[in-house]
């Protein structure tokens, strides 16, 4: 089985090295990742300039584009390699709740799903670098189970690994997405020339960490797996929307 691996932290990130190393024990792996950190770019594509595919000394390939670009390149530009499955990650930091809308890690998996492949995004609920051992041990468990009977149809799964010691991981839970409050206000500043500039403020606090949510269960020490879908239609609002837009 051929597995394409990407991320949004860039090809030099520790998380993608761990993911590639573990996945290589189960499948034929190729890595195509951004040349630099592209966190928060969501599903964006590079349409205003050409892309370049280069190979690093460690064998990983990198692209001067976004995570979504990398999936396109990995699918259509690698000689003698056609992916059956796509893994994205391991992201340095969680991707839970509405964060998934902004995440390049999740976006790479989403693009693969749209192309008709099973896809899994992996994230570690920690940005300090203290819990990579937990992430690696969790991956062995997750991928051993995955490759026993790989999905035969496209799936899109978002996995978050808790920031606890390896022995303190409590198991796996299937969850729904939680929610955050709206992000905080932008932060005004001045550049060295005295010109007004702005920084996007920090993310908002979690507003929904109830039992059964990714925020709640991952925070309680569980590996969370959340099945995602592409259809954003608000089906319960169809009738109300039709009534609002009804004209005689």
Curated annotation (Swiss-Prot):
Q: Which UniProt keywords apply?
A: Cytoplasm, Hydrolase, Metal-binding, Nucleotide-binding
| One Gene Ontology cellular component annotation held by this UniProt entry | cytoplasm
Q: How is the cofactor bound?
A: Binds 1 divalent metal cation per subunit.
- Specify which residues bind a divalent metal cation according to the UniProt entry for this protein: 8-9, 39, 91
The primary location reported for this protein is: cytoplasm
EC code: 3.1.3.5
Q: Which domain of life is it from?
A: Bacteria
| InterPro entries noted in UniProt | SurE, SurE-like_Pase/nucleotidase, SurE-like_sf
**Which reaction is the catalytic activity of this chain?**
a ribonucleoside 5'-phosphate + H2O = a ribonucleoside + phosphate
Q: What class of enzyme is it?
A: hydrolase
Q: Where is the protein localized?
A: Cytoplasm
What Gene Ontology terms describe what this protein does at the molecular function level? 3'-nucleotidase activity; 5'-nucleotidase activity; exopolyphosphatase activity; metal ion binding; nucleotide binding
Write down the required cofactor(s). a divalent metal cation
- Similarity-based family: Belongs to the SurE nucleotidase family.
Q: What does the UniProt record say this protein does? A: Nucleotidase that shows phosphatase activity on nucleoside 5'-monophosphates.
| Record-given protein name | 5'-nucleotidase SurE
Q: Which organism is it from?
A: Neisseria gonorrhoeae (strain NCCP11945)
